[in-house]
């Protein structure tokens, strides 16, 4: 029996990253392998006693080793009690200067803390090969296992057939960190809102709107083309909890996934594509890593290579409802390999290998 300790800082509340990378995969893992693994959750291990820690075989943490900004002290304690630890990363450990959280991360020494945790970890788990190579090349961590994000449809991402308004409903959802990505669609949306042939045939929904956030207001301005959209063309789905946000997809036919091609974005995960696929939505997506390996243009998506493609492909889908059906059906098939039961199994096998080395 493997005794696993999972550190979820937001526990008992669950943040988005903790939900996808820690809570859900280990929840499913405990069901699949209940006779082989015992999982305990805790929100920090800095204050844990040696006696408590000695009862476990492996501890898993996301990004940071310490909640009290003293990672070296925690690393030394884990070494002292002989408890190996795994750091899970689903995006870059360095924030670009134009990132909305850059200065907060700089003030908190996040890059240094994550680097220290990764360098000293028994192993790391990451979402894809590019991020794994980054950690090996820059931080010297060679013991890395690729464990992608997954979706567990039961409960939060179940298929539903919503009642639409006779229009094609496009939608974008995401956090305020994606403002620069959303801007890629502005010109195309502006043209669409004002095109006589199309302006009454579609609607755009902004998922994750945060009323009190100035950046969220800026995203709303972009998606509505600075108010050019009228009430029949634009709507919002307000920010909600991790167990409810999947309901956004029930309001749309087509998921819009813009992403600028830069280091930080390339090291992110393909989660939005997976969410859209499991909710059986057609997708228009930037042809940018980490999405590009899963994209098949005209088969399971429409790939955007230039900002003008947003208008081109949105009108294409308005004109071709059968293509919407074909794309969403194929993407649903293609993402099934990312079902959480498969991903949780991959993660479990990684843990066994780590402990057997």
Where are these regions (language model features)?
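N-terminal pre-catalytic "stem/leader" segment of glycosyltransferase-like enzymes
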Residues: 1-66
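A charged, aromatic-enriched C-terminal amphipathic alpha-helix characteristic of glycosyltransferases
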Residues: 305, 322-355
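Nucleotide-sugar-dependent
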Residues: 180, 232-275, 284-295
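Conserved catalytic-core segment of nucleotide-activated headgroup transferases in glycan assembly
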Residues: 8-28, 152-157, 163-250
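Membrane-proximal helix-turn-helix segments that form the acceptor-binding/catalytic region
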Residues: 80, 104-124
């Amino acid at each position: 029996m493997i005794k696993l300790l999972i550190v979820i800082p937001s526990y008992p509340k669950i943040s988005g990253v903790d939900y996808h990378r820690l809570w859900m995969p280990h929840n499913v893992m405990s069901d699949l392998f209940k006779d082989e693994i015992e999982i305990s959750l805790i929100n920090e291990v800095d204050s844990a006693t040696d006696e408590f820690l000695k009862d476990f075989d492996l501890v898993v943490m996301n990004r940071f080793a310490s909640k009290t900004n003293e990672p070296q002290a925690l690393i030394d304690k884990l070494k002292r009690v002989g408890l190996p630890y795994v750091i899970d990363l689903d995006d870059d450990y360095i924030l670009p200067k134009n990132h909305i959280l850059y200065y907060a991360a700089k003030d908190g020494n996040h890059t240094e803390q994550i680097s220290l945790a990764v360098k000293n970890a028994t192993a790391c788990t990451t979402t894809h090969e590019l991020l794994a190579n980054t950690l090996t090349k820059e931080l010297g961590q060679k013991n890395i296992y690729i464990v992608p994000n997954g979706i567990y449809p039961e409960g939060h991402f179940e298929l539903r057939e919503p009642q639409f308004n006779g229009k094609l409903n496009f939608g974008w959802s995401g956090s305020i960190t994606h403002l620069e990505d959303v801007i890629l669609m502005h010109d195309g949306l502006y043209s669409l809102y004002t095109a006589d042939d199309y302006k009454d045939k579609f609607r755009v929904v902004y998922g994750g709107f945060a009323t009190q956030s100035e950046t969220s207001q800026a995203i709303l301005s972009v998606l509505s083309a600075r108010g050019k959209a009228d009430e029949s063309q634009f709507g919002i789905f307000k920010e909600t909890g991790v167990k409810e946000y999947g309901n956004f997809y029930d309001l749309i036919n087509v998921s819009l996934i813009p992403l600028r091609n830069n280091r930080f974005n390339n090291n992110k995960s393909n989660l939005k594509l997976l969410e859209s696929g499991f909710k059986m939505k057609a997708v228009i997506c930037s042809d940018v890593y980490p999405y590009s390996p899963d994209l098949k243009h005209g088969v399971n998506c429409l790939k955007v290579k230039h900002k003008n493609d947003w208008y081109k492909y949105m009108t294409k889908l308005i004109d071709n409802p059968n293509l919407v059906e074909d794309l969403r059906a194929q993407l649903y098939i293609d993402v099934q390999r990312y079902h959480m039961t498969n991903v949780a199994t991959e993660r479990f096998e990684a843990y066994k290998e780590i402990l057997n080395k």
